[in-house]
Amino acid sequence: MQIHLNIDDLPAYPYPTNFLHFASIEPETDIEPWWLLVYNAGTINNWYKTLKQLYPERTLIPFAKFNANDDIACFDGDDFSGQPHVLIIHAYASEGWELHATYASFDKWLEEAMVQNAEWLNED
């Protein structure tokens, strides 16, 4: 499966290996209410630019969006370790109020996303 990770301002961002593996799995793993931004060219870049305009003091690498609100899961773009924290940013919130949650890694975020997926599916 082709994934699109290009960000004009950060052409060599070191995405976590586990994220790259997860995003490349075919068929795509259902994590609804979250969905990955990597499957359409330009989506990550567009969200990166939007978040940079909203929160210029932050460097946020968006990778997933929550269906029910404006929450965006982002890697900490100032962390080039290959294992950045995941920040849940409520897009369009007033600056200083945008951070909803933090996870130590992509794997920790994915664990929570899978819990949310099970809850989402049980609501039907």
Describe each PLM feature range:
Residues 1-79, 120-122:
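A surface-exposed partner-binding patch
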Residues 31, 38, 86-89, 115:
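Extended aliphatic helical segments
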Residues 76-97:
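Intrinsically disordered, low-complexity regulatory segments enriched in Ser/Thr/Pro
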Residues 90-121:
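Compact, glycine/acidic-enriched structural inserts
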